[in-house]
From Swiss-Prot:
It comes from Rhodococcus erythropolis (strain PR4 / NBRC 100887). Its main location: membrane. Keywords: ATP synthesis, Cell membrane, CF(1), Hydrogen ion transport, Ion transport, Membrane, Transport. The gene is atpC. Produces ATP from ADP in the presence of a proton gradient across the membrane. This is ATP synthase epsilon chain. CDD domains: F1-ATPase_delta (cd12152). Gene3D superfamilies: F0F1 ATP synthase delta/epsilon subunit, N-terminal.
Length: 122
């Protein structure tokens, strides 16, 4: 089966790197699915979105991302997020509390919604 190299990087750290058969991400142009051999593209990730990676040899990886970019070549996908949280590391109750308490903080709301969306997709 064809595969591609994928890197998921946030400003603070590299979250995941390896070979995958599918990447899907939410961009400002809509949700995009990328398989090996995809046409080159550069996309802007939405605030409070998710990225899903299907590794060659493992369970699907899901992360909540808050802004950033997605760069695709025929053999490589690089996801550069302003911030990101792996779904398994997200505190669901804390994210729900942010939604309940921060009705005026749009950035905090977007991050919390993205975190909950990532947990649902994982």
């Amino acid at each position: 089966m064809a595969e591609m190299t994928v890197e998921l990087v946030a400003v603070e750290q590299r979250l995941w790197s390896g070979s995958a058969t599918l990447v899907s991400a939410q961009t400002t142009e809509g949700e995009i699915g990328i398989m090996p051999g995809h046409e080159p593209v550069l996309g802007q990730l939405i605030e409070g979105g998710t990225v899903s990676i299907t590794p060659v040899d493992g369970e699907r990886i899901v992360a909540a991302v808050h802004g950033g970019f997605l760069s695709v070549t025929a053999t490589t996908v690089t996801i550069l997020a302003e911030s990101a949280d792996m779904a398994q590391d997200i505190d669901v109750e804390a994210a729900k509390a942010v939604l309940a308490e921060n009705s005026g903080d749009l950035e905090a709301i977007a991050v919390a919604k993205g975190q909950l969306r990532a947990v649902e997709r994982a």
